[in-house]
Structures are given as C-alpha cells and as structure tokens.
Curated annotation (Swiss-Prot):
GO biological process: defense response
Domain topic, free-text comment: The LRR repeats probably act as specificity determinant of pathogen recognition.
LRR repeats: 656-678, 680-702, 704-726, 728-750
GO cellular component, one term: cytosol
InterPro entries: Apaf_helical, Leu-rich_rpt, LRR_dom_sf, NB-ARC, P-loop_NTPase, Powdery_mildew-R_dom, WH-like_DNA-bd_sf
Pfam families (UniProt xref): LRR_1, NB-ARC, RPW8
Name this protein carries in UniProt: Probable disease resistance protein At5g66910
Free-text function comment from the UniProt entry: Probable disease resistance protein.
Source species of the chain: Arabidopsis thaliana
Keyword rRNA-binding: no
Keyword vocabulary terms for this entry: ATP-binding, Leucine-rich repeat, Nucleotide-binding, Plant defense, Repeat
Amino acids binding ATP: G196, P197, P198, G199, C200, G201, K202, T203
NB-ARC domain sequence ranges: 156-283, 341-440
Entry's family note: Belongs to the disease resistance NB-LRR family.
C-alpha cells in the first residue's frame, strides 16, 4: 500500500516544505491506475499544475498553512490505492470510484480557487517578478479546468425508487387486502409473481406496494422495469445501471450483462435489501427471469404477468374486484345521469357491472364513456350489450369482450385512428407529432390541419382509449406537439390489433409484421400485401438481410428497429404510393442506417421521421426528394456536419420541403449548409439541441419562413442579424434559450411577426426596433415580462402573457 511518510520526509518539523514531495508521489501513483485512465490523468494534471506554486510557497515559509492540502493528498493516495485493485471489467466499482476520484479533483480545484489565492496574497507572491509567469500560466490552467468541470454534469443523484411509476393521487379501490397478502408473500419468498388477466390492476397493485411505508422501510432500493413482449435483457440491465448512476454502458452480449447485474446487486446489497420489479412479463420469457435470479440473501424479485408461472415461482393471483368495490369504482368514473330514479340507476349499475366483470380497466373505460351522458345513452349502451354474441373472446368472458363495446360506439374515423395505435410497440410513449404525421397523409384531405387530428387524439383520450401526457404545463396551440406524449394501456393496444386482424392477412388495411432474427412470416413472401399502413418490427439480432416483399398499396410505413446497424429494405423503392416513413429505433444507442438510396425513387413520399438513429445530414439533399414536405429528427446523432461536397441545387432537390423539425439531437453544433438553401421552407424547429451556439447568416435566405422555433437551445447566444430578412416570419419561439443575450437589432422590420415566445429569457436584450412591431403577442415568464411591460406605453397593441413552464424530462427515458 502506497502512503506518504510525512515524518520520514521531515514534515514534522517543516510541514510545508515537503507537501510538494507528497504531490510528486501522488502524481506518480495516479498515472499508474490504468482502469481509471481518464479521471486519474485529470487528477494528475491538476496536481502537476499545482506543484510549481506549492514549491514557491515552500521556499518562502514553513508551509503549515498547507495542512488542508496534505490531508487531501492523504485521502487521494488511499483512493488511488483502492483504484489500483479494480479490474477494467468491474463497471460497478469503476463507476463508484470514478465519482470519488472526481470529488477529490473538485476539492483540489476548490483549494486552488480559494485557499491558495489567499496564501499567495498573504505572502505577496503575486508581486514578485519571478512568479508572474508561473502564476499567470497556473491560474489560466485552473480556470480552464473549472470551466470544464462546471460545464460537465454533476454526479447523478441516485433515487431510492428507480423508475417506479406514480399513482397521481388516484383513489384506489379494493386493493387493501390484496396488498396485505402480497406483502406477506413477498417477504417470505425471493421471487413472487402477481398473475391475473389484462386490466385487472396488477401494475396498480405493485405500484401501490412500492409506495407502502413498510416496504420502503424494508428495502434500501427499489428498481422498476417494464419488460413487455419484446424483452431485451441487455437494455433492461443497462437501464438499471443508469438508474443507479453508472452512466451509459454497452454490453456485447447477455453474458456481460449478467456479470454487470451481479456486480451491481452485490455492491448494493452491502447497504441493504434490494427489490427488483419486472412489470408485464409475457409467456416465453422464463429464460429472462432466470437471468435476473441471482442467489443473494438480500435480493427479491416481484413480477407481474397475465400468464401463470405457478409451476416455476410462488404466485399471487389477483382476482377481479368484488361487486361493492367495482360499484364504488364505477360511481367514481360516471355519476348518475340526470332525471334518474334511485332504483333505475341501481338497475343500470348492476347490468353494467355484470358486463364489466370486475375488471378495473373495463370499468374505467365504460365509466368514462358514460360520464355526463343522458339516460337514454346509458340504456342504449346496456341494450347494445344484450344483442347477440361479441366477435371477441371465446366461451369464457375475456377482457377484450368487455372492451369491444367501447370500440363499437366510436365514429368510423376514430375507429381507424384507434386501430392505427397498434402499429407502435407496447409500453411506448409516442410523440403526438408522429401520430399526426401519419394521420395527415392517410386521412387528410387537401387543407386538413394538424388541429383536426389533435382533436381526434383528444376524443380518444376523453373515452380513455389512450392517454395524453404533457411534458410541460403549457399546452401548445401553434400546431407543435413534440411536447405531447401519447400512451396506451397494453390491453387497449391488443384490442386495436385484434380489430385489424379480423380480415385475412393479405386483405388487411393495417398490418403488423414481426421479424425475429431473420425469420420472416411465410404468408408475406408469396403474394402482394394490400395494407395502407404497414408496421415492421425487427429485433436486435436481425442482420438486415431482407427478403423481397411486394407492398404496392402501402402509404404509411413504420419501421420499429432494435439493432445497432440497420439497412433499409430495398423493396421500399417499389412502394410508389408511400407518403410517410417513420424509422424508430428502440435500442439503447443510435442505430446506424444504410441503403438510403431506396428512398430516391418514391414520387409521393412527403414525410420522413428518424428517431434515435445516426445519419449524415449531407445524405438528405442527395436523395432528390422532390415531393418531401416534412423532415423530422428526434434524438438522432449526426456526427460531423460536412459542408457542400457536390454541386447540388438544393432548391430543386428539396423543392417542396416546408418543415424541418430537429429535437433532442445532442451533437448538432451547427446547421448543415443546405438548410438555408431550402427556399420553400415555412417552419424550422430546432429544439433541445444544447451544442448549437449560433445560426448561419444564410438563414436570411429563407424568405418564405413563417415559424422559427429555437426552444431550449441553451448555448444559443444570439440570432443572426440576417433574421431581419425573414419577411414572412409570423412566429418566433426562443423559450429557454438561457444563453441568448440579444435579439437582432433590426427585428422591427419583421412586420408580419405576430408572436414571440421567450420564457426564461430575462437576460435577453430588446433592441429599440421592437417598438415597430405592431399587433405583437408575447408569451413569457414573469421576469422576462418586465422587459416588455416597460414598452407598453409606446406599443399600444402589445399583449404580454406571463406563465411558468415546468418540464418532466424523466418521461423521455424510454426513447
């Protein structure tokens, strides 16, 4: 073990004279720790920059005032000694000690920033000509390190409850006794499965258990993960590690992931008991559960599944609600209709509850559909249930049978939209803008606006067939729905798919294909697919070796991918009716796409959306997509933005492109050359791109631009002066651009500008020319509002709306 022998070095008599020797030992040892190369080298670099100043102080005094630094050196040496015994593959200990090394580095820098400067002034070292060069160089290095340290994210806060969903203060009915029974079974067994039919409240019960004070006291940490019917062991373990503050970690195979999981659990159980909740486990996933079974005394697993695993693990069977609880729940959702006698109301309740069969989800859906409705609609609902057999289920009533009437009462256009929801993977939080893009092309007629299809989403949500989740409290009214998520209960997604599958597979208007490894469905290879909406899922073992498929009528294609490398299928080139293409990656890292050339021959392709993929922006104009109207990127990686390498007339190559949407693309630091050359562009949205610091002056070439949206680009310092040439600009959104210091000097020339949104922009200077903006509406926070209120006497038509915005970014973790 390496320690500094301070007495041996003479520190007992001349304390400060040998602190530099201790620093030399620490620098030498830190450089030897290969498993922590980046952080140990950073620590060594900090100490090397400190060494010459310490030597100068030692030469002028006894150095007793360096005792704090000596103590830090002692701690650092002990930590370096521990790090030297950590193997490269031990990601848990590496993560743990990395944070500790970073903390030591912070202490060193803090000493340099405060205490060292006091010592220098006290000893008047700064006034000595011999020290001027040393100190200038030293403090320049320290300032750079402090800037870099302040710009890097702080060590993550690790919650006791990782990813456990919230119950949103919902009044829960009939779960008290099941909770007591489940707690007892869990405390008596290492693995417990909560089993029951879809929609009976399994997830709600388990979430309530995680909130229980006795359980919170019993377990030091609770992990929660949704498994679903497309389980990915590596992704689940990666998320568990990330929830515990280990950062982004890649596993080459499941064996590495198993080792990482064991290391994590062994480390955490040293501090207390651990509970892992695996929600929505499907039949056939027994192998997955066994990988999570690790023989540790303080580790338990709780599973929810609609399938019965009694033969493998202790199981708690959750039964439907008893009548009194079901009745109470229904009354919560649907109050009595007007002009109803107590007896008549009770009779209706009994008939409805008999149909609902005690399933909480069915009660909720039916209750919502009847809420506020007239008596005759209640009676009509009950009568419709008594007419003939339902097309769902079998001899025994199922949840789908209970949900079918809620689908039957939908208007025709809402039925189509509801069935479209089956094209997305389960347990997904889907951007409303993605769904609206598809509906615009499938059901839009000429001048149809996004508002029409947003209304469709609201109608489905009002009947509890899906849920809308706002990332912020401010609801968009300008057709921008990136901050609106759509979620759907799995059983409702199953209902949507069930409706689509009532026709023979080759005749369906909506078709979902699932390709695991390289196994293609046989029925899709020998005859044409007639679907308008085609969704293809491929797992992370898919090799991109496509077989030919004939899809002449496909207008909307959704590719749900999982592999790190993915080639677009060549048969896309023959989809001459294709209007909208969505490529959504559900893997942990951006997928590398190839074979873009298959898109260049599509005469009707109007919308392309990329999610979590790696693309080269220069590829886009080379495709010559003359019919393209909207191009969207979400959580994409672009790498280096290359400049023009070929002679491409962008105005012709993308002659109809009207909207570009770039959101949460973290490595975008500048716009590609071709965007300002898309003269047809009407809407440019660049949001949550924190590396972007400026826009090019060429942005002024977009003479048709009507909407410029730059929300939450933290490092954007200014808008180019050429912005004044955007003569058709109606709306400007710079909300949460915290680094923005000024608006263009001649912004007042934008006479068509009607709206400016600038929440959290109190440091932004308003030029005098804003006074010339007539009929302007400003949306901002209270502090920013003060900048505008001073102008109200001169701007009689100015309208300032102050509001606060809150964002729940945890909702984005599944993307």
């Amino acid at each position: 073990m390496v320690v500094v022998d301070w007495l041996g070095l003479g520190l007992g008599s001349v304390a400060g004279a040998l602190v530099s020797e201790g620093l030399k030992v620490l620098i030498s040892e830190a450089k030897k720790v290969l498993a922590f190369k980046s952080v140990s080298n950073e620590l060594a670099s900090t100490m090397e920059s400190l060494l010459p100043v310490i030597k100068e102080i030692e030469s002028m005094q006894d150095g007793m005032e360096l005792q704090d630094l000596k103590d830090t050196i002692d701690k650092a040496l002990l930590l370096v000694e521990k790090c030297s015994h950590v193997e490269k593959w031990n990601i848990i200990l590496k993560s743990k000690y990395t944070r500790k090394v970073e903390e030591i580095n912070r202490k060193m820098l803090k000493f340099c920033q405060v205490q060292l400067q006091l010592l220098l002034f006290r000893n008047q070292l700064k006034s000595m000509p011999s020290m001027e060069a040393i100190l200038n160089n030293y403090f320049q290095n320290i300032n750079k390190k402090l800037d870099r340290l302040s710009g890097s994210p702080a060590p993550p806060l690790v919650s006791k409850r990782c990813s456990v969903p919230k119950l949103d203060n919902m009044v829960l009915v009939g779960l008290d006794w099941p909770l007591v029974e489940l707690k007892k079974k869990l405390l008596d067994n290492s693995v417990v499965v909560v089993s029951g039919p879809p929609g009976c409240g399994k997830t709600t019960l388990v979430t309530k258990l995680c909130d229980d004070p006795e359980i919170e006291g019993e377990f030091k940490k609770i992990f929660y993960s949704v498994v679903s019917n497309t389980p990915n062991f590596r992704a689940i373990v990666q998320n568990l590690l990330q929830d515990n503050g280990c950062g982004a970690i890649t596993f080459d195979d499941d064996s590495q992931a198993e080792t990482g999981l064991r290391d994590l659990l062994e480390e955490l159980t040293k501090d207390g008991r651990i509970l892992l909740v695996l929600d929505d486990v499907w039949q056939g996933s027994e192998f997955l559960l066994r990988k999570f079974q690790i023989d540790l005394p303080d580790y338990k697993i709780l599973v929810t599944s609609q399938f019965d695993f009694t033969s493998l693990w202790p199981t708690y069977h959750l039964v439907p609600l008893k009548y009194e609880y079901a009745r109470s729940l229904l009354i919560q959702w649907a109050s009595p209709p007007l002009h109803t006698s107590p007896d008549e109301y009770e009779d209706l309740l009994q008939k409805i509850l008999k149909r609902c069969n005690g399933f909480p989800l069915v009660i909720e859906v039916v209750g919502i559909s009847l809420k506020g409705q007239a008596l005759y609609l209640w009676k009509g609902q009950v009568e419709s249930w008594s007419e003939g057999e339902t097309i769902l289920g079998n001899a025994n009533p199922t949840v789908r049978q209970r949900l079918q009437p809620s689908f039957n009462v939908l208007k025709p256009h809402l039925k189509e939209c509801f069935m479209d929801m089956g094209s997305f993977l389960q347990d997904q939080k889907i951007r409303a803008s993605l769904i609206i893009d598809i509906w615009m092309e499938l059901y839009g007629r000429g001048s149809s606006s996004t508002n029409k299809f947003m209304l469709y989403l609201n109608e489905l949500a009002s009947q509890n067939l899906l849920k809308l989740v706002h990332l912020g409290t401010n609801k968009r009214e300008d057709g921008f729905y990136n901050e609106l998520l759509v979620t759907q209960h799995n059983i409702l997604r199953e209902l949507a798919i069930f409706q689509s599958e009532l026709e023979p597979i080759m005749q369906r208007k909506k078709l979902n294909l699932e390709i695991r490894e390289d196994n293609f469905p046989d029925e899709c290879l020998n005859q044409p697919i007639n679907a308008r909406l085609l969704s293809i899922y491929t797992d992370d073992l898919f090799s991109s070796k496509w077989l030919e498929m004939d899809c002449p009528n496909v207008e909307a294609l959704v590719l749900n991918i999982s592999s790190l490398d993915y080639a677009l299928p060549s048969f896309i080139a023959e989809m001459k009716k294709l209007k909208v293409l969505t490529i959504a990656n559900h893997g942990f890292y951006p997928a590398r796409l190839s074979n873009f050339s298959c898109l260049s021959s599509l005469p009707n392709l109007k919308r392309i959306r990329f999610e979590k993929v790696s693309v080269t922006l220069l590829d886009i104009p080379q495709l010559q997509l003359g019919s393209l109207k909207k191009l969207s990127f979400f959580m994409c990686s672009f790498g280096e933005v290359f400049y023009d390498t070929e002679d491409i007339d962008v105005s012709k190559a993308l002659s109809n492109l009207q909207e570009i949407d770039i959101d949460y693309c973290y490595d975008l630091d500048e716009l590609p050359y071709w965007i300002p050359e898309v003269v047809s562009l009407k809407t440019l949205s660049i949001t949550n791109c924190n590396k972007l610091s400026q826009l090019p002056e060429a942005i002024g070439n977009l003479s048709r631009l009507e909407v410029l949206r730059m929300c939450s680009c933290m490092n954007l310092s200014e808008l180019p002066e050429a912005t004044e040439r955007l003569s058709n600009l109606r709306s400007l959104d710079i909300s949460h651009c915290l680094g923005l210091r000024k608006l263009p000097q001649e912004i007042g020339k934008l006479q068509k500008l009607e709206n400016i949104s600038m929440r959290k922009c109190s440091g932004c200077e308003l030029p005098d020319s804003v006074r010339y903006l007539e009929n302007l509406e400003v949306k901002c926070d209270e502090v920013t509002g003060l900048l505008w209120e001073r102008l109200m006497p001169e701007m009689r038509n100015l309208r300032v709306h102050t509001e606060e915005t809150e964002h729940n970014l945890k909702l984005l973790l599944t993307f």
